[in-house]
Amino acid sequence: MQDKSLFALSGVYHIKERLLTRLLRRHGLGRLSPAQGRILMALYEQDDISVRKLSEMTSLDKSTLSLSLTRMEQFGLVERSGDEKDRRVMRVKLTRSGRSHRQACHEATQELTDILYCGVTNEERGVFLRVLNQLFENVSEQERSAID
């Protein structure tokens, strides 16, 4: 029997992205893509960070992150600036407008979390998170070692 886990992971990801788009819209954040929502949530956790750190926190590649940040700057949600100590490093921080959407982002992601874990026990959720974290580590390690 063929392992269908990759198909299932991909399906959950794509449906989750569509649901998140709808939830962001419902909470007044219709201009944001799911990736931009992830960027905001990461910056709510740790503001004024390097683009490299933000890429690590969101698992977005640098080109996707750069395009998303450009759009978010146009929306007035974030601003980029050079690092005072190392001019090669670009930093990102929330604007007042970006900070004002914190509650709406939290509510949208909480709704999505509730949908995802509906019918899943806390024990199952814990096991799932441990396995998912291991899968993440496995693919991250392979990506760092640059499979060609």
Regions found by a protein language model. Give the residues of each.
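N-terminal leader segment of winged-helix/HTH proteins
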Residues: 1-30
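Active-site phosphate/pyrophosphate-handling residues
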Residues: 4-7, 38, 63, 126
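Flexible interhelical turns and helix-capping residues at alpha-helix boundaries
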Residues: 13, 32, 47, 58, ...
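Short, locally clustered residues in the helix-turn-helix/winged-helix DNA-binding domain
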Residues: 13, 41-45, 133
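N-terminal helix-turn-helix DNA-binding core of bacterial DNA-binding proteins
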Residues: 19-64, 71, 146-148
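Charged, amphipathic alpha-helical coiled-coil/dimerization segments
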Residues: 70-133, 140
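Generic C-terminal helix-cap and adjacent flexible tail
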Residues: 137-148
